[in-house]
Amino acid sequence: MKLTKTSLNGVQFFYREGYSDIKTFIEVLSNQSYLKKGMEVLNNESWLDCGGNVGAFSLLAASKGASVITYEPDPFNCELIEKNAKLNGFQNAITVKQAALVHDFRKDTTLSIAQNGNVWRNTIMKKKSNKAIKVPCLNFDEQAVLADNCKMDI
């Protein structure tokens, strides 16, 4: 899979060509979609990024001096988040947990991988998919106490 490197608003990142990655980075880093909705990220805050996708919000928060725990069930997205955190020197600010957040205490679930590169459409809902993988789960209530703020996009 080919990765292309670029930057927006001073944040560098790799994205996968032919996937929805670049659209997500533009929406979050360039268009500032979360900040336009009244969300504010302050220096020294701690955040949970629930449904981290490719890590665009995590990079945004870390660039503002916040620490972030990113939850993302797709292992390929997790690799990309870690690579981009390292690229920006944010490996101490962004912690990636490869897991689906759930309301109960199940240990794992099945993640249906979206087709056509639309990785924001991955789901743990029962859905026919050409590709599905088993992923670990974490209980949301237990994780919620770990940070001051939460961005949830799941």
Which ranges hold each PLM region?
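Phosphate/nucleotide-binding beta-alpha loop and adjacent structural elements of enzyme active sites
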Residues: 1-154
